[in-house]
Amino acid sequence: MIKEFKEFISRGNMMDLAVGVIIGAAFTAIVNSLVKDLINPLIGLFIGKIDLSNLKFTVGEATFKYGSFLNAVINFLIIALVVFFLIKLVNKMMPKKEVEEDDPTPTNEELYLRQIRDLLQEKTK
């Protein structure tokens, strides 16, 4: 069982996934800091409040903390933008796949289907 686990974990895809998760976690911390320490104060200058995470409004007894939601939206947008650019970069670096031209010679199945189609067309005329 340990041998199977060792084979499973040492596959290239599993190692790539592990590295991706670790880098993703570190990147999330960087984005959170960027939003909390740089972007929020910048936005706060324009709306008069420095800490967006404390923004809220109350209706009756319900309190809506929309500041934290704004932080989450900003984090998501930044991460999505970075992932988009990374995918574009990787796609440019990957060699283009040559499009295989279809074999012009029809298979037996295609020939039979064509005959059936032609017979049906003749029958309906």
UniProtKB/Swiss-Prot annotation:
The record, for InterPro entries, names: Mechanosensitive_channel_CS, MS_channel, MSC/AndL, MscL_channel
UniProt KW keywords = Cell membrane, Ion channel, Ion transport, Membrane, Transmembrane, Transmembrane helix, Transport
| Record has Transmembrane helix as a keyword | yes
Q: What is its membrane topology?
A: Multi-pass membrane protein
Q: At the top level of its lineage, which domain of life is listed?
A: Bacteria
Q: Which residues form the signal peptide?
A: none
What family, per the record?
Answer: Belongs to the MscL family.
Question: What is its biological role?
Answer: Channel that opens in response to stretch forces in the membrane lipid bilayer. May participate in the regulation of osmotic pressure changes within the cell.
Task: Kindly provide the name given to this protein in its UniProt entry.
Answer: Large-conductance mechanosensitive channel
* Upper lineage: Bacteria, Bacillati, Bacillota, Bacilli, Lactobacillales
Q: Which gene encodes it?
A: mscL
